[in-house]
Regions:
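Bacterial Sec-dependent N-terminal signal peptides
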Residues: 1-32
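Conserved, well-structured interaction surfaces
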Residues: 48-62, 86-160, 182-190, 196-211, ...
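An aromatic- and glycine-enriched ligand-binding surface/loop that stacks and positions planar moieties
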Residues: 24-90, 167, 189, 193-202, ...
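Long, intrinsically disordered, low-complexity segments
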Residues: 22-24, 55, 63, 79-80, ...
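Flexible, polar/acidic helix-loop-strand segments at domain edges
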Residues: 86, 91-97, 326-383, 496
Length: 497
């Protein structure tokens, strides 16, 4: 096996970057006709294209594409996948809390995230290969890829805990061996904080224009920084740092909130962010994955994944009697979650359907009736409802009850619900219930649950919800088997797998 093959085999971080034709081209400089990263970057367009390639990986199915729901809503039991035989039963493992180390969806997610990191590192390595008309342009490009890299590491630490941390392009077998080692969670979080801090101090705009709603901004970095700080603060392993981390989260969230392009949140249109024709300009939007309707190469699959079969028939959409798509909301779970009369999210963003004769519910968030079947609905990764509810979380975890209630009620009032004044664990439950109501089908549920509840409490919640196979093993995903066996000591397996 030659060195290049070993690099590809040993570590998915050595994924081919958008700027390189192949690993052999990258390593073999003797070919005068080879296009390598060493001679590829000659213009601003080359750098910009590579930055676009970093963003592109976010859209891969098991990363932030439509299959991302398996790792969040399905694991948290807010969605279910009815066709248990698909993928050799691997899809159903997420519903049943029986995910195995050989699960190909887990491997696909791992590979996609590290491919995205690798592409970001390639851009950072070569960003100074060209000259810029303005230092601000360079700053913005670096900030964009560092935001995406931070988003990658946030997903990794939520899903797997300790993971390899790679902050520069790896080019040798020795470099791979040294990097192919799980680093402490604290190291992963620090990488996120460092990247977000760079973005916040960069020349990026506070918020992007509608035309650039799929690009990083300072507010996006502030929100991500805060989310990572909250995730760390509520991790039992970092109890001693909880107060400090919550202060960091409040600082970043307050900064993000101060830049909001609207007045009273109650007056922000609930449906606008999900209107395929308006979501790019929606006041609530912070960062989206952008798709193009009518395009057979740049369309999104969320609509087909989460909607009834007859998605282009408005009449059937209204009466809700079409067969549900591949992921739907269990009837009893939905009615118990949206159990307050007048909740506009239930009446405007959820519709009733049926699957094999049983009543169920599905989302209208990705509604798109494009007759071509190539849908343009975006994935809204960060929005201001998230900022408000994270402020409620941060204040709750800081024992500032009144402030937590204030931000909780902003979201409730916008949804047509009255203000409430719970305290103690009832306030905690109200905040996270509100998050599940607000963000269902937005790939946040299981990570949110980890922020609100201890491992013991999660075990109790899942068991009471009927997850008979759930145990503390399921708190993290397994390290993919094909990665673990390459370095059993450095890429040690998570407990129970």
């Amino acid at each position: 096996m030659n060195m290049t093959m070993k690099l590809n085999k040993l570590f998915s971080i050595i994924a081919i970057s958008v700027a390189a034709v192949s690993c052999s081209d990258f390593l073999n400089l003797s070919d005068p006709n080879a296009v390598t990263t060493a001679n590829y970057y000659t213009s601003l367009t080359d750098i910009q294209n590579s930055v676009n390639g970093v963003y592109a990986v976010l859209k891969e199915g098991n990363f932030m594409g439509s299959s991302a729901c398996y790792f969040e809503e399905n694991k948290a039991r807010f969605l279910t996948f009815p066709d248990t035989g698909v993928g050799g039963g691997e899809n159903a493992q997420f519903d049943n809390c029986t995910v195995q180390a050989g699960n190909q969806m887990v491997l696909s997610r791992w590979n996609a995230i590290y491919k995205c990191i690798d592409r970001a590192n390639v851009v950072l390595k070569h960003i100074d290969d060209i000259k810029y008309s303005s230092a601000d342009v360079r700053s913005q490009l670096e900030a964009e890829v560092r935001f995406v890299r931070a988003l990658c590491y946030y997903t990794l630490v939520c899903d797997w805990g300790p993971v390899p941390v790679v902050l520069s392009k790896i080019e040798t077998l020795d470099g791979v061996n040294k990097a192919n080692v799980r680093q402490p969670k604290e190291t992963v979080y620090q990488a996120i904080f460092d990247d977000c801090e760079f973005v916040v101090s960069s020349k990026l705009p506070d918020l992007q224009t509608a035309a650039n709603c799929g690009r990083a901004s300072k507010v996006a970095a502030e929100a991500l920084w805060a989310k990572a700080a909250l995730q760390m603060a509520t991790d039992e392993d970092f109890a001693a740092k909880k107060e400090e981390l919550c202060k960091t989260a409040i600082t970043q969230l307050t900064a993000a909130w101060s830049k909001k392009p609207f007045g009273d949140f109650k007056n922000v249109d609930l449906e606008e962010i999900w209107d395929v024709d308006k979501q790019a300009t929606a006041a609530e939007g912070i960062f989206q994955l952008v798709f193009i309707g009518g395009s057979n190469s740049a369309n999104s699959s969320y609509n087909t994944q989460f909607r009834p079969t007859d998605i282009n028939d408005p009449a059937k959409e209204v009466n809700g009697k079409a067969s549900s798509g591949s992921h739907f909301m269990p009837f009893n779970k939905t009615t118990s979650l949206y159990n307050e009369a007048g909740d506009l999210r239930m009446s405007k963003l959820i519709a009733r359907g049926s699957h094999k004769g049983s009543d169920t519910y599905y989302t209208l968030k990705y509604r798109d009736l494009d007759p071509s079947g190539y849908y343009g609905c975006n994935n809204v990764v960060l929005r201001y409802a998230d900022v408000a509810l994270m402020l409620a979380e941060a204040y709750y975890h800081s024992n500032q009850t009144a402030k937590a209630q204030e931000y909780l009620n902003m979201v409730r009032n916008r949804a047509g619900l009255p203000s409430v004044t719970p305290t103690g664990t009832a306030l905690r439950d109200a905040i996270y219930t509100e998050r599940w109501r607000e963000f269902v089908y937005e790939f946040k549920a299981f990570s949110d649950m980890k922020r609100g509840y201890t491992k013991a409490e999660m075990l109790d919640l899942m068991k009471k919800d009927g997850a008979t196979e759930y145990d503390n093993t399921d708190y993290y995903l397994p390290i993919p088997h094909t990665q673990h066996i390459l370095n059993p000591d450095g890429l040690y397996q998570n407990p129970g797998y």
